[in-house]
């Protein structure tokens, strides 16, 4: 994994964290410039995630012989354990300590749909969000993984074209009334941006440098700042792709940085568990009449330490053991390495 991309993935996760800080503690109301920035533009961390996901999946499967079902099994082992754990924790809080997450309502049927990545209206009535609200992005991720798995039926050089055509076809189907509105979101095309960056990287089209990539990042951030997400693919998706490309170009300045690499490893757990921690912090703040700044300052290290433990125990050890177990069950074929 490119360390520059790992660093960007960590940064994107924490941008989303502070976006939700503004939501949970301040209902997106802010007086300061930084507060408004996180409230109004912090969601762009998701766009960066999607571009990185397309890049990582493309690079991690190049030159490998793998069956569609094996690819999906790898992704399930990577995504599901931590997601199910934090979804169940959120469900328990909603069911038995609803005052911690008062905008939500518990519904078993909705929980089951959430666990299997099926978009459904949240019982709280605020949109197509799963029980663990941040899991809406994983519904898109699993959809992308499914399309990518199907792409293994064609030759490697045709996979990108296959996925583009499949997405275009699906977009046409998504206009039908029987199709969920969830899949009409243009954000799914940001995975394609990531795959295109993977092609460019493998072919040596992304030249290493420092000043030009920094200028690209600055221009991209200004674009994101000046435009909202009404045309998300253009206003946030394309600048996010340019930011990822610029970080790849600066890889020599990140290479061998173990701390940044580890922060990137922990980013998935940061993303999954941060809303639970923030909600608990908000509850304590309101009950004990504490200053929001004090509680937020306490929540940040709690999220960081919990994410580190989650990565080490669930994403790393549990997934590796599951990989070995499944590999033994599968016989000599084994599993391709997880990414």
Task: Give the residues covered by each predicted segment.
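Alpha-helical transmembrane segments in multi-pass integral membrane proteins
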Residues: 1-7, 11-14, 18-38, 58-70, ...
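Membrane-interface helix-loop-helix regions
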Residues: 24, 34-44, 52, 58, ...
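Structured binding elements
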Residues: 49
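Phosphate-coordinating loops and pocket residues in cytosolic domains that bind phosphorylated ligands
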Residues: 73
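Active-site helix-to-loop segments that bind/position phosphate- or nucleotide-bearing substrates
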Residues: 76
């Amino acid at each position: 994994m490119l360390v520059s991309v790992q660093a960007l993935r960590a940064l994107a996760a924490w941008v989303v964290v502070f976006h939700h800080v503004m939501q949970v503690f301040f209902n997106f109301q802010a007086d300061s410039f930084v507060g408004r920035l996180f409230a109004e533009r912090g969601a762009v961390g998701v766009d960066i995630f999607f571009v990185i996901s397309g890049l990582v999946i493309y690079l991690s499967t190049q030159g490998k012989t793998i069956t569609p079902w094996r690819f999906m099994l790898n992704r399930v082992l990577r995504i599901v354990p931590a997601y199910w754990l934090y979804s169940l924790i959120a469900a328990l809080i909603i069911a038995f300590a609803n005052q911690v997450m008062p905008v939500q309502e518990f519904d078993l049927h909705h929980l089951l749909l959430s666990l299997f990545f099926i978009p459904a209206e949240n019982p709280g009535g605020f949109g197509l969000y799963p029980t663990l609200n941040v899991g809406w992005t994983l519904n898109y991720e699993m959809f992308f993984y499914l399309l990518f798995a199907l792409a293994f039926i064609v030759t490697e050089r045709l996979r990108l074209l296959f996925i583009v055509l499949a997405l275009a076809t699906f977009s046409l189907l998504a206009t039908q009334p029987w199709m969920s509105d969830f899949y009409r979101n243009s954000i799914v095309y940001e995975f394609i941006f990531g795959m295109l960056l993977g092609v460019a990287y493998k072919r040596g089209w992304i030249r290493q440098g420092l000043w030009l990539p920094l200028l690209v990042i600055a221009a991209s951030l200004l674009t994101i700042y000046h435009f909202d997400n009404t045309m998300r693919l253009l206003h946030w998706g394309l600048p996010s792709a340019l930011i990822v490309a610029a970080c790849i170009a600066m890889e020599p300045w990140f290479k061998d940085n173990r701390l940044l690499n580890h922060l990137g490893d922990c980013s998935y757990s940061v993303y999954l568990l941060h809303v639970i921690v923030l909600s608990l912090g908000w509850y304590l703040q309101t009950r004990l009449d504490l200053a929001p700044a004090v509680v937020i300052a306490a929540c940040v290290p709690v999220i960081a330490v919990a994410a580190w433990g989650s990565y080490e125990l669930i994403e790393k050890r549990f997934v590796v053991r599951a990989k070995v177990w499944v590999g033994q069950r599968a016989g000599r074929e084994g599993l391709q390495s997880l990414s």
